[in-house]
């Protein structure tokens, strides 16, 4: 699985002008299930995300996790994270999991976040979405369970 995580002051996602998910301080997680991914990879990724020490402590050092700060998460499906740009000028997305498998893994990842006690909201799988965010830092981290 692949994720692009961004530390945010706040974020929201809209579908057809209506807000479908939002969070205050915490993480915006753009998530992509890759072909062949399993629930075990989702578990590995989500556990790492919840424990990653990327929030500032009292001294201003990145030393606190999402769990430590009681932050929220907004999870948005993002199959374009599977882009292969090695040939030509048009990205290929064949490395992404098929939609049905991708959605199941996406929903599993969301359930895992909630199971860790993270207040989690989502976008709408497969929809065209407008994502609004206010970066904190900015802190943006690429994660890939196959790397």
From Swiss-Prot:
Family: Belongs to the DTD family.
Entry text on domains: A Gly-cisPro motif from one monomer fits into the active site of the other monomer to allow specific chiral rejection of L-amino acids.
A GO molecular-function descriptor: Ser(Gly)-tRNA(Ala) hydrolase activity
UniProt cross-references to InterPro entries, sorted A to Z: Daa-tRNA_deacyls_DTD, DTD-like_sf
Complexes and interactors: Homodimer.
Keyword Nuclease carried by entry: no
Keyword Hydrolase: yes
Keywords: Cytoplasm, Hydrolase, RNA-binding, tRNA-binding
Catalytic activity: glycyl-tRNA(Ala) + H2O = tRNA(Ala) + glycine + H(+); a D-aminoacyl-tRNA + H2O = a tRNA + a D-alpha-amino acid + H(+)
GO CC annotations on file: cytoplasm
Major location (coarse): cytoplasm
EC number: 3.1.1.96
Location of the motif Gly-cisPro motif, important for rejection of L-amino acids: 137-138
Broad class of enzyme this protein falls into: hydrolase
Name of the protein in question: D-aminoacyl-tRNA deacylase
Its job: An aminoacyl-tRNA editing enzyme that deacylates mischarged D-aminoacyl-tRNAs. Also deacylates mischarged glycyl-tRNA(Ala), protecting cells against glycine mischarging by AlaRS. Acts via tRNA-based rather than protein-based catalysis; rejects L-amino acids rather than detecting D-amino acids in the active site. By recycling D-aminoacyl-tRNA to D-amino acids and free tRNA molecules, this enzyme counteracts the toxicity associated with the formation of D-aminoacyl-tRNA entities in vivo and helps enforce protein L-homochirality.
SUPFAM superfamilies in the cross-refs: DTD-like
Subcellular location per the Swiss-Prot or TrEMBL entry: Cytoplasm
GO terms for biological process, alphabetical: D-amino acid catabolic process
């Amino acid at each position: 699985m692949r994720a692009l995580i961004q530390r945010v002051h706040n974020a929201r996602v809209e579908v057809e002008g209506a807000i479908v998910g939002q969070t205050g301080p915490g993480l915006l997680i753009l998530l992509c299930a890759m072909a062949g991914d399993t629930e075990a990879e989702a578990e590995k990724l989500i556990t790492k995300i919840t424990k990653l020490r990327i929030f500032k402590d009292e001294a201003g050092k990145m030393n606190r996790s999402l769990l430590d700060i009681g932050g929220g998460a907004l999870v948005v499906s993002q199959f374009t994270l599977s882009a292969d740009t090695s040939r030509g000028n048009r990205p290929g997305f064949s490395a992404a999991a098929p939609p049905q498998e991708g959605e199941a893994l996406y929903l599993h990842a969301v359930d895992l976040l909630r199971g860790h006690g993270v207040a989690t909201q989502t976008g709408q799988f497969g929809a065209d979405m407008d994502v609004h965010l206010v970066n904190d830092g900015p802190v943006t981290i690429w994660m890939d369970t196959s790397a």
